[in-house]
């Protein structure tokens, strides 16, 4: 049985970093996939699918549902261990509903929790624009601009209330304060995940 944790949070909340640190500390038990990283890897491969994905990411728009679902299901089924952290999903009510329907049909996938790494828009903005300023030449992300940040933030916040209600009603939502130090956030998330597996 694959135990799945979905990690959501605003752009710049630190969700990807938090999850990757936890997975690195427990490589024999936990694996981390970022939907963003999975999609960016496809873009880097230069495939036709990658070119399609790139056109959405560069604008800060949502990648089509079928592409994301296929990417996530493949990652879960091929995961080398039984505990999987996936961050950056779901980002819309449509994604949430489609994924819930899929998981409910799968006997070997247990959605254990949806962890929200909560930060204010001000903190998220400072982190994202700071990340752009600190990027080495050639390592800038096309989605780290103020205009794209505003679009990404709107895409994140618009469906957030519905996503929170949906997972709260199922008893699956856990909120972690992402405005603390990296060590504090990682420590709380790690203890929570380990307590559930």
From Swiss-Prot:
This is Adenylate kinase. It catalyses: AMP + ATP = 2 ADP. PROSITE patterns: ADENYLATE_KINASE. Belongs to the adenylate kinase family. ATP binds at residues 12-17, 131, 180. It comes from Sulfurovum sp. (strain NBC37-1). Keywords: ATP-binding, Cytoplasm, Kinase, Nucleotide biosynthesis, Nucleotide-binding, Transferase. One of its GO terms (molecular function) is adenylate kinase activity. NCBIfam families: PRK00279.2-2. Residues 130-144 are annotated as: LID. Coiled coil: none annotated.
């Amino acid at each position: 049985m694959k135990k799945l944790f979905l990690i959501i949070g605003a752009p710049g909340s630190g969700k990807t970093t938090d999850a990757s640190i936890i997975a690195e500390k427990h490589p024999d038990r936990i694996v981390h996939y970022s939907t963003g990283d999975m999609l960016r890897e496809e873009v880097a491969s230069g495939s036709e699918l990658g070119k399609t994905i790139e056109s959405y990411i560069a604008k800060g728009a949502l990648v089509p549902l079928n592409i994301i679902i296929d990417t996530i299901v493949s990652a879960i089924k091929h995961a080398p261990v039984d505990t999987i952290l996936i961050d950056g999903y779901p980002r819309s009510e449509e994604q949430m509903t489609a994924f819930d329907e899929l998981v409910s049909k799968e006997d070997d996938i247990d959605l254990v929790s949806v962890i929200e790494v909560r930060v204010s828009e001000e903190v998220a903005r400072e982190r994202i624009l700071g990340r752009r300023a600190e990027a080495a030449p050639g390592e800038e992300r096309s989605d780290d601009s103020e205009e794209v940040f505003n679009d990404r933030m709107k895409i994140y916040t618009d469906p957030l209330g519905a996503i929170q209600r949906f997972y709260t009603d199922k008893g699956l939502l856990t909120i972690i304060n992402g405005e603390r130090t990296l060590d504090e956030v990682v420590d709380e998330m790690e203890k929570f995940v380990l307590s559930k597996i």
